[in-house]
Curated annotation (Swiss-Prot):
Annotated family: Belongs to the HisA/HisF family.
Reactions catalysed according to its record: 5-[(5-phospho-1-deoxy-D-ribulos-1-ylimino)methylamino]-1-(5-phospho-beta-D-ribosyl)imidazole-4-carboxamide + L-glutamine = D-erythro-1-(imidazol-4-yl)glycerol 3-phosphate + 5-amino-1-(5-phospho-beta-D-ribosyl)imidazole-4-carboxamide + L-glutamate + H(+)
Cellular component per GO, a single term: cytoplasm
Transmembrane regions: none
GO molecular function terms noted in the UniProt entry: imidazoleglycerol-phosphate synthase activity; lyase activity
Origin species: Streptococcus gordonii (strain Challis / ATCC 35105 / BCRC 15272 / CH1 / DL1 / V288)
Protein name: Imidazole glycerol phosphate synthase subunit HisF
PANTHER family: IMIDAZOLE GLYCEROL PHOSPHATE SYNTHASE HISHF, IMIDAZOLE GLYCEROL PHOSPHATE SYNTHASE SUBUNIT HISF/H IGP SYNTHASE SUBUNIT HISF/H
Amino acid sequence: MLKKRIIPCLDVKDGRVVKGINFVNLTDVGDPVDASKAYYEAGCDELVFLDITATHEERDTTIEMVRRVAEQVFIPFTVGGGIRTVEDMKRMLQAGADKVAVNSSALANPQLLADCAEKFGSQCVVLAVDAKKEADGSWHVYLAGGRKDSGRELLDWVQEAVGLGAGEILLTSMDKDGTKSGFDLPMLEAVSQVVSVPIIASGGAGSSQHILEVFEKTAATGALAASIFHYGQVSISETKKAMQAAGLEVRI
């Protein structure tokens, strides 16, 4: 059985962490290596870096950041944002990323998933999906940070993507994102019914109870959050103790 994973998410731009992190022991809150080490020491299981760097020219700073993190942090980490080609993924993996996440580029060109999985293995290929509930009760996949409806139905898209080679799904609920009201349990459960790959739940975490709940009530194997960890509102070690007490498989 897969151990349940707690996964902080860090937004990076120009090789620096943005959306401040309020760790008292950080000398440089914007340094991804410092932030990663602090999370590693706090007991997180994995990390996700979302690169919001706009232009291709600035990619080199991201590659350098990945290299620095890989040298000093010894837990798996995923990098997403701006990955459009097999070559983009290759550069991230060669720099030391364990997995690479693709979102809008996979929607625009689903063959990218198959090409990357064939070259590097499905275990490296993460499908990131932003989804929102529609009036008819279905969920649609959204683009542009949840502002544009792709027209794709969520359950259809995840099945197609896994069939092409995605080895994991990072599933963000745009309805829940930023609300701190808990994860979107019905959506997570619906997706887990149609695919067999690991699912990381994202969007809505506001407390350690929400993390416990998503693991007890859905098949998600990872819980991703940003601000509750960045600002020290939730202790990773305390959450893990609560998970262990609830009988969940967890790395302490």
